[in-house]
C-alpha cells in the first residue's frame, strides 16, 4: 500500500531541477541536525562583547521623529545618518572600515530599531543581509573588495539586490532576467535585459547587485547559468525611477530596469564565478533568513506584548482591570 502511494506521489511531483539540487547541496547544517538526530552537543557558554557604541544607538532611537522614512522628501536625513554612523557595516570586517558584529548583537540592534519603526528597521536590515556587501565578502575579488567595501561601510554606497521580477520571486530562478555574452567594440561583454521589481532600497540605492541567467550561444566564454554582477547607479541605460509604495509601507522599494552592457569583471568574483550565482545566493541567505527577518518579527512581538500588557492594566470591566480577571 505504502509503495503504491509513494509511486503515485512520485509521479505527480516534478523532478528536482538543477537549481534546486544546487540549493540542497549548498551551505551546511546547524544545531537543527543535532536535534533531529538526537545527538546534541551543548557548546560552552559564549560571552559576547558588544562592539557597537550604545550611545550611537540611543541617539538614533531618541532623535528619530517617527515621520516615515519613505515616502518622505527628507528621507535622506535618516538614511545618511545610518550610513555615516556605520549602521550599514555590521557584516564588514574592520580592515574595510566596518564593525562586524556577532549574530547576537546584530539581532538585538535590529530588534530595537524595528520596535521604534519597522520602515527604519528594514532600511537598516537590507544592507546587512543578502546583497552586494555579503556577496563581496564571501566571493568578491580583492580588487572589488577594496573598491566597494569601504564605501559600503561608511554609507557612501547604499546597496540593494535585484533578483525578483514579474515572474520570479519565491521561485527565484523562474523566468529570471537574461544576459547574453557578445562582442562589442572588440571585447567580450554581457548584454543584460533588466526588469526587476519589488526591490527594497532600489529608489535610493547607488550600488546594485543583479542576478540574471547568462546565455552564451556562440560559446565565447564557454560558461552559462545564473550569474551575479555589480552595477552602479550611474551605469548607462540603467533606470531606477519607478517606486512601489504599497500601503505606504514606509521604506524605499521599486524597480530596476534597462538594457545594459556590463564587463566580465563586473561579475562578483570575476569571470571564474560566471554561472555560480545560484550557489552563491543560497550560501548567503542565512544572514537575512536566519537573523534579520526573525529580529524584525521579534520586535513586532515585543511591541504587541508591551501594548497589550499596558492596555489590560487600564481597561476595566466588571469594576476591575481585565488583566486581573
Regions found by a protein language model. Give the residues of each.
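A short core secondary-structure module
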Residues: 188-238
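Flexible, small-/acidic-enriched active-site or ligand-binding loops
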Residues: 236-261
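Short Gly/Pro-enriched turn/cap motifs at secondary-structure boundaries
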Residues: 167-170, 198-203, 244-253
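A gly/ser-rich beta-alpha-beta helix-loop segment of oxidoreductase catalytic cores
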Residues: 160-180
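A glycine-rich, basic-preceded beta-loop-alpha segment at the flavin cofactor/substrate interface
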Residues: 255-289, 306-324
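Glycine- and acidic
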Residues: 64-69, 89-95, 113-118, 129-134, ...
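Amphipathic, small/basic residue-rich leader segments at the start of a protein or domain
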Residues: 1-127, 134-156, 170, 186
